[in-house]
């Protein structure tokens, strides 16, 4: 029964979290965006103490339920492992106990924490489980989903139905796509062969919650009087944490999947209340060494302190400051001296230190402005570019859904007064000078009224007019760059500000 309940909840979470990355209409984000905000790493980086405390308490009460129900990469592994189990009957019972690889677990955890403190967000993003699944969903699943939608839109249009509409299918970043593909391949292989190996050797969240779950109040317990040593529970344990020879369970690796309860035909395993200190006393009577238990507490304390310290350090480092005339040829991105980050991110320092590169904002951006960065120091973290669209002043979608607090929630009014960059004109590329034609497209579409058209020849008021930008009024939305008819590079482009300003 408990296993079925776990599967139902896991399916619901997995379905809607995946849909957050697939839904290009933005409908699902208004209802299910909270599922992204309760993910562990984004909650830590956002200093969302309520969510972090709730997840720790949940783990202390019920074990690593987060890993088996809420975490999408965990459920994804279960789906792959289940699929392998369905190929042959013997594959259902292919697992066996293996000792914990602590040097790997703690090594990856230290690397993750050090990368957070050092500000190398790209390294941390590679290890963060929610971010890993976000890259897989947005880079591998989303194009397939969009292509399927376009097929339905094609047939619906011929039936005079507009229930579906076509959307553009494109790869936003080749390096991020390759990383997502490699991540998918590694997780698929590990899950297909060994179940939850990734969770218990690589995932930093699994290691952190493993410290807590050692002392959980409810957990699977083996009744040695009922046990017949058949080994079925151990052979179906995808976490490989049941040592049948010693009748012990490594609770730091147990993900509370309840598979062992269903596998046991004798009812020798039950999920029940067990006082941590009482259990430790019982273990101590049969085990002469007390060191490991003491070390567990030290590790848990050190890890928690390191996480809180690193998150607080990131928070303290924040600095708050007010502040068709051409052929249809594809646009190329200009070489920007300073990258553009979304309104609400405050600037580069805050954004890059808090962003987990989960790709949720990239998937949700309705105008194709956000895409993963290819720069080494900000690899996979979103950046703005205006070849396919521009950032509407009335759109605040990315600020509404960011689970890590890298993009703070702002109103439409606030966004209209935030300057993320300013436009720069290259008069040599402007078609007024290059092709000797009239234009003014940039000035017509500037929502801030920051672009004026003045005579090219100051002495001849009838001469063709060229654009001039008022940098004090420009908010960096990119409308001018996107709608400029010059190809392949726009004659006007936006340079970002490392620190956003209020105008």
Language-model-derived ranges and their functions:
Residues 1-247, 252-253, 259-503:
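Non-ligating segments of multi-cofactor redox enzymes
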């Amino acid at each position: 029964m408990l296993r079925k309940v776990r599967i139902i909840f896991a399916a619901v979470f997995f379905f809607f979290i995946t849909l957050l990355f697939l839904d290009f209409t933005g409908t699902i984000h208004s209802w299910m965006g909270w599922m992204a905000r309760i993910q562990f790493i984004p909650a830590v980086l956002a200093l969302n103490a309520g969510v972090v405390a709730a997840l720790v308490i949940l783990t202390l009460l019920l074990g690593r339920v987060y890993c088996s129900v809420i975490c999408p990469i965990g459920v994804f592994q279960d789906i792959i492992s289940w699929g392998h189990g369905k190929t042959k009957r013997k594959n259902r019972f292919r697992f066996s106990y293996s000792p914990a690889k602590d040097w790997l677990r703690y090594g990856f955890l230290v690397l993750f924490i050090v990368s957070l403190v050092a500000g190398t967000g790209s390294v941390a993003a590679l290890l963060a489980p929610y971010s890993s699944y976000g890259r897989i969903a947005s880079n591998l699943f989303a194009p397939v989903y969009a292509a399927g939608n376009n097929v339905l839109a094609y047939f619906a249009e011929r039936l005079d139905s507009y229930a579906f509409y076509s959307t553009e299918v494109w790869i936003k970043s080749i390096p991020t796509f390759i990383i997502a593909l490699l991540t998918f391949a590694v997780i698929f292989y590990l899950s297909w062969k060994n179940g939850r190996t990734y969770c218990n050797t690589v995932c930093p969240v699994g290691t952190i919650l493993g410290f807590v779950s050692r002392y959980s109040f409810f957990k699977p317990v083996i009744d040695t009087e009922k046990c017949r040593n058949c080994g079925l529970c151990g052979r179906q344990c995808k976490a490989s944490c049941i040592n049948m020879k010693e009748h012990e369970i490594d609770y730091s690796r147990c993900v509370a999947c309840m598979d062992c309860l269903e596998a046991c035909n004798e009812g020798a395993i039950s999920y029940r209340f067990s006082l941590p200190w009482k259990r430790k006393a019982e273990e101590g009577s049969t085990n002469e060494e007390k060191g490991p238990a003491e070390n567990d507490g030290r590790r848990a304390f050190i890890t928690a302190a390191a996480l809180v310290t690193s998150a607080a350090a990131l928070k303290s480092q924040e600095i708050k400051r007010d502040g068709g005339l051409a052929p249809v040829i594809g646009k190329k991105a200009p070489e920007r001296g300073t990258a553009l980050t979304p309104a609400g991110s405050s600037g580069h320092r805050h954004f890059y230190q808090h962003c987990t590169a989960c790709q949720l904002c990239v998937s949700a951006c309705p105008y194709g402005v956000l895409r993963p960065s290819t720069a080494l120091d900000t690899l996979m973290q979103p950046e703005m570019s205006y070849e396919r669209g521009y950032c509407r002043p009335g759109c605040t979608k990315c600020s509404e859904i960011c689970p890590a607090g890298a993009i703070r929630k702002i109103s439409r009014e606030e966004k209209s007064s935030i300057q993320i960059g300013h436009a720069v004109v290259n008069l040599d590329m402007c078609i007024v000078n290059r092709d000797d034609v009239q234009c003014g497209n940039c000035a017509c579409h500037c929502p801030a009224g920051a672009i004026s058209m003045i005579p090219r020849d100051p002495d001849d008021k009838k001469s063709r007019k060229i654009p001039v930008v008022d940098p004090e009024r420009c908010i960096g939305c990119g409308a001018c760059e996107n709608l400029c008819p010059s190809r392949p590079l726009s004659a006007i482009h936006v340079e970002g500000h490392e620190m956003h300003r209020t105008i």
